[in-house]
């Protein structure tokens, strides 16, 4: 399964001569291009029975932004890693649609009690990814981030808040269902697992459909997994949840939050700093768990508290996924290449080996030579006898040249799938 996922994603990043060359800005820097989808992903991820991916893919903030037109709506896949996830979700929607039309499901729906009128799926009323002022992909995270005076979330530092109150606030995040009937939440997780999708998906349409179907199964005593075979063609791609080794499927959400809180606290971060991260609603529970597991893989490495503080400042779901991906890339380097002796996160996340090498993980798709990179490459705190950047995607020839000229070694296609 893992090999299939890796092969699919790696095949999707093969670059041909047809890829658009980024324009050269008058300042000497490049501008981010619009690429051709057919040059980025295999055909099966671009068109299927229920979806078509737009042929043009703009790059913004180092992230390739795919648009998926489907029978169930238009969906955005920000990043090559997200494309198979969103495509799989469309196929899952088709299966749920087919399921809802069966005689058995109709009978179960007739037996089911009414869903609580207050039940819903927590989706941000105005997703920060689209708010004017944050249209930047993950580019902001390569700048120095001013964290000292920034109050990320007031609730995180509210005096007198009990543990229960803070846990309640932590559950108010993107992708969380709010039906509290005993046993329902597990039914929903099991359904998501059978479909090969993230139970805490940020796809609002799928999340609501999962809740609807799981409620019928739970309340109407309809055995979905035994009565109906749900096999999704793109389940080989699975979801972001695969990075957590099925933890998000098998563990109640309250336990996931408590486990993440404990791991973040073990870094030496203060309670207020930990709560600022845990209560950041832009982190889906899956991404928060992925981040916690990455930090745990670096257990004992000084400086992990800086990652907690940095992670809490994420403003968008793109930035949250970047932080989680970066720390897991760094953990893989620590485990497989050379031990990391120190972690810091001035913007971006950095690792230093005992030999003094500087390691920068970059879970991004496409790196053009932008002005912010020119500034970052010359920063005093980003200098070392040996400097290595690992990129899950690739750089333009110009960016490669400029980084190499400044003493950097670049490793491309260091895929996030390989973190596992």
Predicted regions and their residues:
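Bacterial N-terminal signal peptides
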Residues: 7-18
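Sec/Tat signal peptide C-region and signal peptidase I cleavage site
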Residues: 19-25
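Cationic, glycine-rich low-complexity segments
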Residues: 26-155
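Amphipathic interfacial helices
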Residues: 94-147, 165-232
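Membrane-engaging insertion elements
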Residues: 138-160, 236-279
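Acidic-basic catalytic patches of nuclease active cores, encompassing PD-(D/E)XK
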Residues: 263-348
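Conserved catalytic cores of phosphodiester-cleaving nucleases, focusing on short active-site segments
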Residues: 322-382, 386-391
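Domain-level recognition of nuclease-like catalytic cores that cleave nucleotide substrates
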Residues: 394-420
């Amino acid at each position: 399964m893992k090999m299939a996922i890796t092969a699919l994603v790696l095949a999707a990043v093969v670059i041909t001569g047809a890829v658009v060359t980024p324009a050269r800005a008058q300042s000497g820097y490049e501008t981010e291009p619009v690429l051709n989808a057919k040059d980025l992903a295999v055909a099966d991820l671009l068109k299927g029975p229920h979806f078509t991916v737009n042929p043009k893919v703009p790059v913004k903030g180092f992230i390739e932004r795919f648009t998926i037109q489907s029978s169930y709506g238009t969906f955005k896949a920000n990043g090559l890693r997200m494309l198979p996830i969103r495509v799989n979700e469309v196929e899952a929607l088709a299966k749920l649609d087919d399921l809802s039309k069966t005689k058995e499901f109709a009978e179960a729906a007739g037996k089911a009690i009414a869903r609580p009128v207050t039940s819903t799926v927590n989706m941000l009323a105005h997703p920060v990814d689209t708010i004017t002022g944050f249209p930047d992909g993950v580019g902001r995270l390569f700048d120095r981030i001013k964290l000292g005076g920034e109050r990320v979330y007031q609730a995180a530092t509210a005096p007198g808040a009990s543990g229960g109150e803070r846990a309640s606030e932590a559950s108010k995040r993107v992708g969380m269902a709010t039906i509290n009937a005993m046993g329902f939440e597990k039914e929903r997780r099991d359904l998501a697992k059978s479909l090969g999708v993230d139970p805490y998906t940020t796809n609002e349409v799928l999340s609501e459909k999962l809740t609807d179907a799981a409620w019928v199964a739970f309340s109407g005593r309809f055995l979905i997994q035994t009565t109906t075979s749900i096999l999704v063609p793109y389940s080989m791609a699975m979801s972001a949840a695969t990075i957590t080794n099925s933890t998000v499927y098998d563990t109640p959400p309250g336990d996931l939050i408590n486990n993440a809180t404990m791991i973040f606290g073990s870094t030496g971060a203060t309670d207020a700093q930990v709560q600022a991260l845990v209560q950041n609603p832009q982190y889906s529970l899956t991404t928060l768990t992925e981040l916690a597991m990455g930090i745990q893989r670096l257990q004992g490495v000084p400086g992990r508290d800086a990652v907690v503080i940095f992670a809490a400042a994420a403003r968008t779901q793109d930035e949250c996924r970047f932080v989680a991906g970066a720390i897991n890339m760094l953990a893989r380097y620590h485990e497989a290449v050379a031990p990391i002796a120190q972690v810091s996160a001035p913007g971006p996340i950095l690792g230093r080996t005992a030999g003094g090498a500087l390691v920068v993980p970059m879970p991004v798709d496409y790196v053009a030579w932008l002005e912010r990179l020119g500034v970052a490459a010359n920063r005093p705190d980003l200098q070392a006898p040996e400097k290595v950047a690992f990129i899950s995607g690739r750089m333009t020839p110009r960016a490669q040249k400029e980084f190499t000229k400044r003493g950097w070694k670049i490793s491309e296609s260091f895929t996030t799938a390989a973190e596992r």
